[in-house]
From Swiss-Prot:
Encoding gene per record: MRPS33
Keyword Transmembrane helix applies: no
UniProt-recorded name of the protein: Small ribosomal subunit protein mS33
Highest taxon above the source species: Eukaryota
Subcellular location(s) of the protein: Mitochondrion
Keywords, in A-Z order: Acetylation, Mitochondrion, Ribonucleoprotein, Ribosomal protein
A GO CC annotation given for this chain: mitochondrial inner membrane
Length: 106
């Protein structure tokens, strides 16, 4: 006489699949693989994605502080100065519809 009926075996396999357990008995080597796949991926672990600060937030905050005058970003100051000098020399890109080809048509 068998210990479990066909129905009981099917139900136990189904419940194992539903609750992320191993459906059939497996050896220790296979269980090691199952354990590895059941762990959360490295990129989804909190200690991984909380390692670096949220750059978008910090960038926006530093921009606000810079505009108020509480933070000095020398690299951005340099880029702004270069753009200002470029405008003075007339070397800025023309706006749409004001380029060489548009000037020819007029």
């Amino acid at each position: 006489m068998s210990s479990l009926s066909e129905y009981a075996l099917r139900m136990s396999r189904l419940s194992a699949r539903l609750f992320s357990e191993v459906a059939r008995p497996t050896d220790s080597k296979s269980m090691k693989v199952v354990k590895l796949f059941s762990e959360q991926p490295l990129a989804k672990r909190k200690e991984t994605y909380d390692w670096y600060p949220n750059h978008n937030t910090y960038f926006a905050l530093m921009g606000i502080l810079r505009s108020v005058g509480l933070y000095r970003d020398e690299h951005q100051d340099f880029k702004d100065e270069q753009l200002r000098l470029k405008k003075l020399r007339g070397k800025v890109k023309p706006r749409k519809g004001e380029g060489k080809r548009a000037a020819k048509k007029k």
